[in-house]
Structure formats: C-alpha cells, structure tokens
Amino acid sequence: MNRNDVTEKIITVKVSKGIQWADVAKKVGLSKEWTTAACLGQMTLDDKQAKVIGKIFGLTAEEQKWLQVVPYKGSLPTPVPTDPLIYRWYEVVSVYGTTIKELIHEEFGDGIMSAIDFSMDIQRQADPKGDRVNVVLSGKFLPYKTY
C-alpha cells in the first residue's frame, strides 16, 4: 500500500457514492481547493483531518496514516500535460508567464509568489455568453535576499 493507492480509493469511493468535494471540505473545515488537493495526494493532513476523510471515504487506520505522510508534490504524469483542462493552464503559463513574472516583479521587486503560503478560490461566474471559470490565486510574496 502507498499514498497513490489511498488516492485511488478516495476517487473510487467519491465516484461510486456521488460525493462532492465541497461537501468533504465542509466536514473537514477547510477550503474545497485545499481539501481536494489533499485527497488527490498533494497535501499532508493532520490526524484529525485524516480521520474525517477516513470516515467519509471508508479508509482503514493504515490508509489514514498515508494521508499524514508528506507527499511527493506534483502530480502530472508527463512534462507537458495531456489532459485538455490541465493543458490550458500550461498554455496560460506558456503565453502569460513572462507577463505575470514581469508585473509581479514591477509591483513587488525581485522574488517569487509562494505556493506554500498560498490560497486558491475557484468559482462559477454566470455570463450570458456562457459561464466562466473564475480562479483566484493568492500567494505570499517572498523577496530574494542578499547575503
């Protein structure tokens, strides 16, 4: 057994029971974005969170322990994503990455946006031309230090 096995079990139970990530997040007490990432194997849960997830998805004590192991982050199976939705994100970064970098540096100086001290919010935005996906990424700015 490993973390990937637990992730697969979570996904299988989610599909078979029609569970929604927002409902899981509500029970865990965290955002749907973070909770989903955790259930998909990208975040580490504490004991209390793992027990809640375990109850929802029928996980054994051993499987709950795997939820508490620091995961190998980055879940894409190929360097260039092949899933169409994930590829669009790759495309956004390919097209707008230098613009994002330039504007962040202009506003904040030399540094990076943290993906550790970070939050994300995904919402549906009604639009007469077709609903839109509204994604807000918020990361702490971390300036490079001189030494």
From Swiss-Prot:
Catalyzes the reaction of cyanate with bicarbonate to produce ammonia and carbon dioxide. Keywords: Lyase. This is Cyanate hydratase. The lineage of its organism: Bacteria, Pseudomonadati, Pseudomonadota, Betaproteobacteria, Burkholderiales. The active site is at R88, E91, S114. The keyword Isomerase does not apply. One of its GO terms (biological process) is cyanate metabolic process. It comes from the Bacteria. Coiled coil: none annotated. CDD domains: Cyanase_C. GO terms for molecular function: cyanate hydratase activity; DNA binding. Belongs to the cyanase family. Its EC number is 4.2.1.104. It catalyses: cyanate + hydrogencarbonate + 3 H(+) = NH4(+) + 2 CO2. InterPro entries: Cyanase (IPR008076), Cyanate_lyase_C (IPR003712), Cyanate_lyase_C_sf (IPR036581), CYNS_N (IPR048564), Lambda_DNA-bd_dom_sf (IPR010982).
